[in-house]
Amino acid sequence: MEVLNICQVEELEMRGDSMTCKLVDKGSVNQVVQQQGEWVHLGSGEITIDSAADESCWPIDEGGAFEIRSSKRNILLKAANGQAMRHLGEKDVTFKDEMSGEVLGMTFQVTEVKKPLAAVWRLVEKGNLVQFGPSDAQCFIQNLQSGKRIQLHKRGGSYILKVEYVRWVPVFPGHA
């Protein structure tokens, strides 16, 4: 199974009934996962692409299937109005792009935001080009190494990535 990632998936690890997906901080995008199992659908959603965000942020009350872990960095997060926000840790979120069906992954800082926000500079840092244009066809994230594109959609004054949240569930051979 090939996994296309905004951030490369290094390792999938089960802890209890939740999955930990470790992401590599590199620009490459393709990774083959050598483990038997399947991606389980957790629901559909949207991630807003934010060109002004300092970090990719995730709402406190969303994505319970993805474990929150302590951040390795001490981050001071502020809302657009300058108000300080609590930083509760970070989580790796896996999802399928609605158009290609390919599995993607990103690390988000968990804080007091209303919706998931992907920081453009973080996407660029991972080796991607982020393009906004007047039509949906001109709005995408493109990995510079592979050339693969992820379609974005314009909604009002925002650009969004429509996704299906998924979690890797291993299947152990010989167990029914």
Segments from the language model and where they lie:
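Generic structural hydrophobic/aromatic packing signal, biased to beta-strands
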Residues: 6, 21, 77, 93-95, ...
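Sterically constrained small-residue positions within well-ordered secondary structures
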Residues: 40, 68, 84-86, 97-99, ...
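Residue-level detector of intrinsically disordered, flexible termini
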Residues: 51, 78-79, 136, 175
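Aspartic protease core domain of the pepsin/retropepsin superfamily
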Residues: 56, 89-176
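C-terminal reverse transcriptase regions that engage the nucleic-acid substrate
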Residues: 75-89
